[in-house]
Amino acid sequence: MDQLDQLSDYFPPPLPVGQTLFDWGKRTYVMGILNTTPDSFSDGGEFNSLPTAIHQAKTMVQGGAHIIDIGGQSTRPGAETVSLKEELERTIPIIQALRQELDIPISIDTTRAEVARQALQAGADMVNDISGATFEPEILAVAAQHKAPIILMHIRGNPQTMQNLTDYGDLIGEMRQFFSAQVDLARHYGVLPEQIILDPGIGFAKTAEQNITLLRQLPELKRLGFPLLVGPSRKSFIGKILDQPDPKERVWGTGATCCRAIAGGADIVRVHDVEAMAQICKVADALWR
């Protein structure tokens, strides 16, 4: 029996993060994306100065965001890795400034333990690791030390190689195995089960068809007993369905995807277009919760 089978009947208790209590199952929480990068796939270069980043964060809060997710390293397919120094310079000043002005939970989107450590010291509340702690497992020790929730995403390879690693015999079964190993590792490092959130990793080492399959079978991952974060925002599989090459024109396709995710048990949706998605989530919650 693997780690997750042992926890299959575990229902996550409410999670306090800063001044917010996340009461799982009662509503969908909206995570607003704040990329401070010049090369993110849909908003690169728009918010990589302190004034524009702060303005965008406040706009997202006014639009209904419950979490602001700050990232200084693009994770689009083929993205090059920036230096540790550059990633810190892109994120830490913004976290420090936002912490002075907003009470909302702040998430640091990073795969590096040192970035996570400095971000949490600067005022971030949680860690969002798109590698699921496979790049730098010591990031789990940082989260445990700070008693910070951590989001573990499913991926194969890295942003340079992941789209060549989409050959699955059993997509959901292999994702379960991945999460089993990473949850076990997180607990080994001292992360409490109630501080773990899982992300199936839409668009990461998955084809368009596999992303659709994943969304259809999301309840199978919900059965693992952990809160689920789903990040479909403006992704290329939506563009393929809509024949829409411009990521910013995929808003309503993103909305439809969020509805499917919520019906399948998603607890958090990670999105660019916060105001529109917050309204969609409210209606979806009224229908399915």
Swiss-Prot record:
It catalyses: (7,8-dihydropterin-6-yl)methyl diphosphate + 4-aminobenzoate = 7,8-dihydropteroate + diphosphate. InterPro entries: DHP_synth-like, DHP_synth_dom, Dihydropteroate_synth-like_sf, Pterin-binding_dom. One of its GO terms (molecular function) is dihydropteroate synthase activity. Keywords: Folate biosynthesis, Magnesium, Metal-binding, Transferase. The gene is folP. Catalyzes the condensation of para-aminobenzoate (pABA) with 6-hydroxymethyl-7,8-dihydropterin diphosphate (DHPt-PP) to form 7,8-dihydropteroate (H2Pte), the immediate precursor of folate derivatives. Mg(2+) binds at N35. Residues 28-282 form the Pterin-binding domain. This is Dihydropteroate synthase. GO terms for cellular component: cytosol. (7,8-dihydropterin-6-yl)methyl diphosphate binds at T75, D109, N128, D199, K235, R270, V271, H272. Pathway: Cofactor biosynthesis; tetrahydrofolate biosynthesis; 7,8-dihydrofolate from 2-amino-4-hydroxy-6-hydroxymethyl-7,8-dihydropteridine diphosphate and 4-aminobenzoate: step 1/2. Its cofactor is Mg(2+). It comes from Synechocystis sp. (strain ATCC 27184 / PCC 6803 / Kazusa).
